[in-house]
Curated annotation (Swiss-Prot):
Name of this protein: DNA-directed RNA polymerases I, II, and III subunit RPABC4
Primary gene name: POLR2K
The protein's assembly and partners: Component of the RNA polymerase I (Pol I), RNA polymerase II (Pol II) and RNA polymerase III (Pol III) complexes consisting of at least 13, 12 and 17 subunits, respectively. Pol I complex consists of a ten-subunit catalytic core composed of POLR1A/RPA1, POLR1B/RPA2, POLR1C/RPAC1, POLR1D/RPAC2, POLR1H/RPA12, POLR2E/RPABC1, POLR2F/RPABC2, POLR2H/RPABC3, POLR2K/RPABC4 and POLR2L/RPABC5; a mobile stalk subunit POLR1F/RPA43 protruding from the core and additional subunits homologous to general transcription factors POLR1E/RPA49 and POLR1G/RPA34.
Localisation per UniProt entry: Nucleus; Nucleus, Nucleolus
Job of this protein: DNA-dependent RNA polymerase catalyzes the transcription of DNA into RNA using the four ribonucleoside triphosphates as substrates. Common component of RNA polymerases I, II and III which synthesize ribosomal RNA precursors, mRNA precursors and many functional non-coding RNAs, and a small RNAs, such as 5S rRNA and tRNAs, respectively.
GO cellular component: cytosol; nucleoplasm; nucleus; RNA polymerase I complex; RNA polymerase II, core complex; RNA polymerase III complex
GO molecular function terms attached to this record: DNA binding; DNA-directed RNA polymerase activity; zinc ion binding
This protein's UniProt keywords: DNA-directed RNA polymerase, Metal-binding, Nucleus, Transcription, Zinc, Zinc-finger
Zinc finger (C4-type): 19-39
Family in the record: Belongs to the archaeal Rpo12/eukaryotic RPC10 RNA polymerase subunit family.
Organism of this sequence: Homo sapiens (Human)
Pfam families listed in its UniProt record: Zn_ribbon_RPAB4
A biological process term (GO) from this entry: transcription by RNA polymerase III
Length: 58
């Protein structure tokens, strides 16, 4: 009855961030420093998802 062994952890996928200075796309994993690979700028913006997002008005 060990169901914990059957459950696999989610795979670490890199998120895509856009540099605030040079506007290049950077793939950043969970342990990577938040820094542009091209210019070294530290302000990064998360890229908008392509998945459909629906908000319910209440």
């Amino acid at each position: 009855m060990d169901t914990q062994k059957d459950v696999q952890p989610p795979k670490q996928q890199p998120m895509i961030y856009i540099c605030g200075e040079c506007h290049t796309e950077n793939e950043i994993k969970s342990r990577d420093p938040i820094r542009c690979r091209e210019c070294g700028y530290r302000i990064m913006y998360k890229k908008r998802t392509k998945r459909l997002v629906v908000f319910d008005a209440r």
